[in-house]
Amino acid sequence: MQVSLSSNFPALSPNDSSAPAPDGELLSALIEEAIAAYSPVPPQASADSVSMRQNLMQLLSWAHSLEQVAARTVERVQILGTGMRSVVVCVAYKPAAESAESLPTSIIVKRYRRKDSTVNAGGFGYLRERYGLEALNLQVPGLFPQLYGADPELRVLALEDVSAGTVEGEQYSVAHALLEGTEQQALDALNYYIEAYRPLAASGIMGEAVEEYRLNLARADRKAHFPGAIASPGLAERGLKKLYGVADEARSPEPDADSMDSSSAEHEDAPVLPAAVEELSFRFRRVLQPFFTKRPPVPEQFKLNRGKVYMLSSGDFSPQNVLIGSADGTQVRMVDAEGTCLHHRGFPFVEAMLGFPSSPEYPRYRVDRMKALPALYSALFEDAPLDEHLAEDLAVCTAVTVCALLELYSSSARSGLLPRIRREGAQLMRLLLEIAGSQDATLAEFADHLGALK
């Protein structure tokens, strides 16, 4: 069932379900060309399979009746990604007639692999991107791709191709400039990154678009306790336990053995969670899943205090997802909203301060912390002073980031990066606490433990 998005984007006309069928032979030939041209790099999967050919044919046939396509002939198919979560293709079409010159020359079609992605809002996936793009474009119009169409049965989205109109060559991302550009080009690119996050932070979380986003996730996923909070929060806690050598099944110590119920008694033989890990787990959850992200409705007063340091964004802070546009067009665009969430504004700041350790080319990104990152802090926090409370929040954001990467990288080819990530994470935590004069013993001790490499 193809879903018209006309109500969300008034300029769009209803989908044309009576469009003539596409040329199957032409599509098959273009699919073969796309597969032959695609060279996946791990963890991307091979596209050379029967199932992939079937999926691509299904995607192209579905997109044919979109109003933005208007049954035009496909000229080229390019496979952009075959990751664990989704398959992404760019489809270029024959130019529109003069009467329809506003139609796009290409679109992005994205299919999500997980069968539960249309009912599970806990991680990155269909629901967060489908409803997230609507919310993000209401918060900051034009920053993210337009959503052209959605089909929950196929788990497919059709999106604006924001690379159309960027500088010549491949997509000119901030990451590309940080890797390949001159010192000045890298500095300029970081300024683009900052300008992308400035309006997102300024929009805050009090608007109707944010609450509607959370309501949409709550309706789609009846089991979501914190709809719209940061995706996959358990990663950081598992990484924390790994750091302290604690088993995953470790339990909190019982305050009163006589008051244990039957369910807790079943786990009485499980190892006890050390006090430091229990306290840090609580601190992690306080930042990742603040009270105001519980299932709506939530009284507005709960957002007035802590909510001031939260924002809605794509939830992926990689410089790869910030594109620098052509000189005569939009100067900066962002892509990939699979993880759209309400999160503490400290997370993009910490990512940049650590040199973007969550991104594929870390540690090769050239990040001038002294010149560029004070401006990022100002853009995110509107020149608020780094007081004790904010510094401790940022230290927790640092701890969460490092622990999540410990869980993700420890059994992968990137495990060799962890000593550096731990060391620099500990240094950043100490710096933040020192600048603000914080006496938080829990965070100080954690920083020491984090930096104590064996």
Show where each model-derived region lies.
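ATP-binding glycine-rich loop module of kinase domains
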Residues: 90-125
